[in-house]
């Protein structure tokens, strides 16, 4: 969703000016949406839609001035313990949609990090797609270029499908996992795949989800059919605690060797991911605490968005 800065309304204002005025009346003057609609001669529905556009485009940003916003104490401890560049810990809320709230937190972090026309590399998973859905207007207005970090077009559509048609998206034209290591090697040598992988490694910022072996059936990589339950069991027995982009690592953050899927994946390996300057991990749930800690120890992420309960569990582990 983008702000139309060329169309002039009946009131003689472009859409961006309408958004700015509505935001001022709503947040600074405390007017209701009905009062604003009367003042500007707009329908209440139009006022509501313009407020939403303002949030999605980044014109309107809500800042909560409290030392508890973002759970400052947890953020400080995580930053020090794991040498993180950026941390956002969202307050815990019982029975809330954790994935959606993490997506909002991650979107806010990315809006503060990304500069116009920079490139954002995205990994697959529910957390990253939740984030992408809340960045649509910002990506379009700031001309942010997107590139996927792994194959598997379908895994990205819940996020990419929400973007403006004018957004620049570079997708790896291959599955996430090939049926054999030989086929994976062949596909990765195709120019159309190789070029996207090179673009991904050249990204300014990356955002990835973090899976945990302890999630069992709830893990995205299992629900998406990329590995079987039997494979997950064997991977766990080899000491793996979590994965990023399908690559599994142990509690120390070291990639686990002799795992079949690693040779069949089509995507950026973790060693290449580490060369991207800012690598944001977005994940929540106490059952992911060990995996998130391991991802930070391995240096695969240097920025984190998580929730209060998960942050506490990470610091206890």
Curated annotation (Swiss-Prot):
Impact when changing residue 26 to H: Greatly reduces the DNA binding ability. Retains tetrameric assembly
Activity regulation information from UniProt: Inactivated by phosphorylated autoinducer-2 (phospho-AI-2). Phospho-AI-2 acts by binding to LsrR, which is then unable to bind to the promoter regions, allowing the transcription of the target genes. Phospho-AI-2 triggers the disassembly of the tetramer into dimers and reduces the DNA binding ability of LsrR. Dihydroxyacetone phosphate (DHAP) may act as an anti-inducer and inhibit binding of phospho-AI-2 to LsrR, preventing induction of transcription of the lsr operon.
DNA-binding region: 33-56
Gene Ontology CC: cytosol
Keyword Transmembrane helix attributed: no
GO biological process, one term: response to heat
Domain of life: Bacteria
GO molecular function annotations of the record: carbohydrate binding; cis-regulatory region sequence-specific DNA binding; identical protein binding
Key words, A-Z: Activator, Cytoplasm, DNA-binding, Repressor, Transcription, Transcription regulation
Matches recorded under Pfam families: Sugar-bind
Membrane-spanning parts: none
Keyword Iron-sulfur attributed: no
UniProt subcellular location: Cytoplasm
InterPro entries: NagB/RpiA_transferase-like, SorC_transcr_regulators, Sugar-bd_dom_put, WH-like_DNA-bd_sf
Result, substituting residue 288 to A: Forms tetramers in the presence or absence of phospho-AI-2. Decreases affinity for phospho-AI-2
Induction: Autorepressed. Part of the lsrRK operon, which is positively regulated by cyclic AMP-cyclic AMP receptor protein (cAMP-CRP) in the absence of glucose and negatively regulated by LsrR.
Outcome, altering residue 33 to A: Greatly reduces the DNA binding ability. Retains tetrameric assembly
Phenotypic consequence of gene deletion: Deletion of the gene causes a significant increase in expression of the lsr operon and results in accelerated removal of AI-2 from extracellular fluids. Deletion of the gene affects the expression of a number of genes associated with attachment, defense and pathogenicity. It also affects sRNA expression.
Similarity comment text for this entry: Belongs to the SorC transcriptional regulatory family.
Function: Transcriptional regulator that represses the expression of the lsr operon (lsrACDBFG-tam) in the absence of the quorum-sensing signaling molecule autoinducer 2 (AI-2). It also represses the expression of the lsrRK operon. Acts by binding directly to the lsrA and lsrR promoter regions. In the presence of phosphorylated autoinducer-2 (phospho-AI-2), LsrR is inactivated, leading to the transcription of the genes.
Comment, domains: Contains an N-terminal DNA-binding domain and a C-terminal ligand-binding domain, connected by a linker region.
Annotated NCBIfam families: PRK15418.1 (NF011947)
Name assigned to this protein: Transcriptional regulator LsrR
């Amino acid at each position: 969703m983008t702000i139309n800065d060329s169309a002039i309304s009946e009131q003689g204002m472009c859409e961006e000016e309408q958004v700015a005025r509505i935001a001022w009346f709503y947040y600074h003057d405390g007017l209701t949406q009905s009062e604003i609609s009367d003042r500007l001669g707009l329908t209440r529905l139009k006022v509501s839609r313009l407020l939403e556009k303002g949030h999605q485009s980044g014109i309107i940003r809500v800042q909560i001035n409290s030392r508890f916003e973002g759970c400052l104490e947890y953020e400080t401890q995580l930053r020090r313990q794991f040498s993180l560049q950026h941390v956002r810990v969202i307050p815990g809320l019982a029975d809330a949609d954790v994935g959606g709230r993490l997506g909002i937190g991650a979107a806010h972090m990315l809006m503060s990090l990304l500069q116009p026309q920079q490139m954002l590399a995205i990994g697959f998973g529910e957390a990253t797609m939740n984030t992408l859905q809340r960045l649509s207007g910002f990506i379009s207005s700031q001309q942010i270029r997107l590139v996927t970090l792994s194959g598997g077009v379908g895994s990205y559509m819940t996020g990419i499908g929400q973007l403006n048609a004018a957004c620049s998206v570079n997708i790896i034209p291959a599955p996430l996992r090939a049926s054999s290591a030989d086929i994976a090697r062949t596909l990765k040598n195709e120019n159309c795949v190789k070029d996207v992988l090179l673009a991904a490694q050249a990204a300014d910022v990356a955002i990835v989800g973090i899976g945990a072996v302890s999630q069992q059936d709830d893990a995205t990589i299992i629900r998406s059919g990329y590995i079987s339950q039997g494979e997950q069991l064997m991977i766990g027995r080899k000491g793996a605690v979590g994965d990023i982009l399908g690559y599994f690592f142990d509690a120390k953050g070291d990639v686990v060797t002799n795992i079949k899927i690693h040779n069949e994946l089509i995507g950026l390996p973790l060693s290449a991911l580490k060369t991207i300057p800012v690598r944001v991990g977005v994940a929540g749930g106490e059952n992911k605490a060990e995996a998130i800690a391991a991802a930070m120890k391995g240096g695969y992420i240097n920025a984190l968005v998580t929730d209060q309960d998960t942050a506490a569990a990470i610091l206890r582990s």
